[in-house]
């Protein structure tokens, strides 16, 4: 499965939402996410695509990524209305999120094109706070030579837009940039995780591995 073959030259935005869910609630949570939530979000003007991932190793179990034309999509009347007019199903399942993590980010330092079935998410260590963009560009240039590399980019959270979810803890909440690598196989993702960690002087175990479940493009909606 592929979607969104390449980011345009303008800086895109991305909504990053990761969460755990109690096992007893997972069937209805997944049904809601697949049948209602993704489509609702992707229909918002300025949203380009939405995708669901599940953890292979590390991180919260579920991850949703929503790409937008720019960060401006998160300041529109339509986006605010999506929260003010929640369905009962949405209210129920948003309350089921456990240890959620919400970030609204600028997508920077893009290398490659296409969408991989595997995702590496590396929260950057504090030592990279000085020049994350340059290091992300250099890392992408090196990693694209690895077999199975699809694309890499840096997610830079916007402090004003990254408001926490109702059940998200604000204690020690750090808006850390995240380096993301997409790969075509699990083996490639493992190798790219090691390479990404080395590029940022990070522990490979601090990176999360996810697998794509499904994706929806705004262009596919009627």
Question: For each predicted feature, which ranges?
Answer:
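Macromolecular interaction modules
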Residues: 1-222
């Amino acid at each position: 499965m592929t979607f969104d073959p390449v980011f345009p030259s303008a800086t895109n935005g991305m909504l990053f939402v990761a969460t755990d869910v109690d096992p007893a609630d997972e069937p209805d949570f997944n049904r809601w996410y697949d049948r209602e939530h993704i489509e609702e979000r992707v229909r918002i003007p300025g949203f380009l695509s939405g995708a669901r991932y599940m953890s292979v190793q590390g991180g919260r179990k579920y991850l949703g990524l929503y790409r937008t034309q720019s960060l401006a999509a998160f300041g529109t009347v339509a986006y605010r209305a999506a929260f003010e007019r929640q369905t009962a199903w949405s209210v129920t399942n948003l309350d089921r999120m456990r240890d959620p993590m919400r970030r609204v980010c600028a997508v920077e330092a893009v290398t490659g094109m296409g969408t991989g079935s595997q995702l590496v998410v590396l929260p950057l260590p504090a030592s990279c706070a000085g020049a994350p963009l340059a290091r992300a560009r250099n890392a992408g240039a090196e990693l694209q030579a690895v077999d199975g590399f699809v694309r890499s980019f840096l997610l830079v959270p916007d402090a004003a837009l990254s408001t926490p979810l109702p059940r998200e803890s604000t204690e020690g909440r750090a808006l850390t940039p995240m380096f993301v690598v997409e790969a075509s196989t699990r083996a490639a993702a493992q190798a790219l995780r090691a390479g990404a960690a080395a590029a940022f002087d990070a522990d490979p175990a601090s990176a999360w591995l996810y697998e794509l479940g499904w994706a929806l493009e705004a262009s596919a909606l009627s």
